[in-house]
Amino acid sequence: MDIKSLMNTKQDILRSNLQILIDHPVTKGDQCESAWIEFFRGFLPNKYAIDKGFIFDSKGNISEQIDIIIYDALYTPLVFCTNSGEKFVTAESVYAVFESKPTIDKTKLEYADKKIKSVTSLYRTSREMISSGKRVGPRKLTPILGGILSVDSVGIDTISKHVNRYKGIDFGCAINNFTFHVRRNENREFLSLITSSKDETILSFFYLILDELYKLGTVAGLDIREYAYATLEQFKIERGGV
């Protein structure tokens, strides 16, 4: 078996698993996020956690409810969980967020963009760290990626027309149609739109997500002191050192 046949088999498995989950009565309709969460958990490395919920910062701001959050599983100290399974995740810990809908169209793109911007507008800290015994300065904050996921979609020409306006959206996947990737410059201005064929939708999305997450590396270390200052009235953690 050659590598192409191997990866095509991987695509068939991913597509089949995702279709089964989405067609299940529990997830059918507008609330398909659990199917996509299981999809991501099925192939992303263990350094990533995937959940639904809210994202908050040290200033007391909270995002809108997010269908799928990909966040750091190793260095995320403040994750709270509701009885319904929704997580509250620190803004510094987030790699990517997604909105899940049955169909992608102009209204859904606008809605997803609004949700994504409720996350990317949050305040994030960055702190010095010790690496290999040496002090390293605070890392530059990495972008928080945003996307939309669905079963079906309007045509790619319509997508291209609107993602120029909705700058929070970096990519999307409609499993019955295509995967798309929006290329932007440092100012989030539209450069081009890359799309997959229908036959390669899932595998293209698989490679795209892995590549984009790899390029981010590891999120910056959050400054826990900022959260302490915001929540403690008497006890204060001293600044200084790392």
Located regions from the model:
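Intrinsically disordered, low-complexity Ser/Thr/Pro/Gly-rich regulatory segments
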Residues: 1-65, 70-242
